[in-house]
Amino acid sequence: MTNLRKTHPLLKIANDALVDLPAPANISVWWNFGSLLGLCLITQIATGLFLAMHYTSDIATAFSSVAHICRDVNYGWLIRNLHANGASFFFICIYLHIGRGLYYGSYLYKETWNVGVILLLLVMMTAFVGYVLPWGQMSFWGATVITNLLSAVPYVGNSLVQWIWGGFSVDNATLTRFFAFHFLLPFIIAAATVIHLLFLHETGSNNPTGLNSDADKISFHPYFSYKDLLGFAALLIALTSLALFSPNLLGDPDNFTPANPLVTPPHIKPEWYFLFAYAILRSIPNKLGGVLALLFSILVLMLVPILHTSKQRGLTFRPITQFLFWTLVADVIILTWIGGMPVEHPFIIIGQIASFLYFFLFLVLTPLAGWLENKALEWS
């Protein structure tokens, strides 16, 4: 008799994705982040569902409903802290996952990569609308500032902003629809994740050498299922440690003050994981230019496969591009720092240089270095 997991219509799909999947024998811990992102998504949906049971999306009660969750609901404080800090870990994993893709040339699986970029945009949208829900000062003003950027769209800008607001300012209608979006989007993300995996399993995983690994495959289970389990344990220990010992470390103190349209906080800034993009937005004096730069700071990832010039796939044996990659990492860290600083000298010029370098690395230096390394190989 054949094994049920190989014949059952539903089980064989799971089997082909999680048990009998042939995986390269040499994939490192950098290949763990995909499954960790899956774990993050499941954790966020689970904690979010329990929060939604007690949350009210009305400006009169939203702030106090969050306080009520933390004070009166059984383990509500824990669920809320896990959900808020889970978002941070989600983005840590996303950025490491993207960094791995850039380093090892995984972006040459174009469909998988492009679905991944769409996933990043969806997660960013979800995090943004979610941050508005507690209706604190930074929630309100963050929503006001970011939605206002759409007014830079020529001709239809103002109508667009009022349409999204549901009125002439960020108000009750805005909060209600943001809650609806925040509830809906994670399920769209889950669906897009399935598509992401579907495309990945058409080609199989890349590996640290960037060479074809068909001759050296091992089954996903038990080898990588247990390796993933170790990653799960590390992530969950880190998340619970942060949520239990220092839950407000990454939050903004301004969000402990209920939203007040009459008082603007001294420094309006998003959560840490958006600061690099916020710095790029602010570094351009023109409103429309800033909005386009903000959009392109993420969409530039879609150009990476097109701009790949090297004959080799990964950066494992490419010292020049390796240097550029780590320059990019340092640049994003600098942008993150600048995004959290006030708009004054010397932060303005540092932000502008870092923003220019960000795009210059992606669009000019990396393709050039790839071409140069090809030439060096021809000469040697």
Curated annotation (Swiss-Prot):
Gene3D superfamilies xrefs: Cytochrome Bc1 Complex, Chain C
Pfam family, one: Cytochrome_B
Cofactor: heme b
Gene Ontology biological process terms from the UniProt entry: mitochondrial electron transport, ubiquinol to cytochrome c
Membrane topology according to the record: Multi-pass membrane protein
Keyword Transport part of the UniProt annotation: yes
Cofactor annotation comment: Binds 2 heme b groups non-covalently.
Top-level taxon in the UniProt lineage: Eukaryota
Residue positions binding a ubiquinone: H201
A GO-annotated cellular component: respiratory chain complex III
Keyword set, alphabetical order: Electron transport, Heme, Iron, Membrane, Metal-binding, Mitochondrion, Mitochondrion inner membrane, Respiratory chain, Transmembrane, Transmembrane helix, Transport, Ubiquinone
InterPro entries, per the entry: Cyt_b/b6_C, Cyt_b/b6_C_sf, Cyt_b/b6_N, Cytb/b6-like_sf, Cytochrome_b, Cytochrome_b_C_euk/bac, Cytochrome_b_N_euk/bac, Di-haem_cyt_TM
Stretches that traverse the bilayer: 33-53, 77-98, 113-133, 178-198, 226-246, 288-308, 320-340, 347-367
KW Metal-binding (keyword) present: yes
UniProt binding sites for heme b b566: H97, H196
GO molecular function: metal ion binding; ubiquinol-cytochrome-c reductase activity
Miscellaneous notes: Heme 1 (or BL or b562) is low-potential and absorbs at about 562 nm, and heme 2 (or BH or b566) is high-potential and absorbs at about 566 nm.
Listed name of the protein: Cytochrome b
Organism encoding this protein: Dactyloptena peterseni (Starry flying gurnard)
Lineage: Eukaryota, Metazoa, Chordata, Craniata, Vertebrata
Gene name for this UniProt entry: mt-cyb
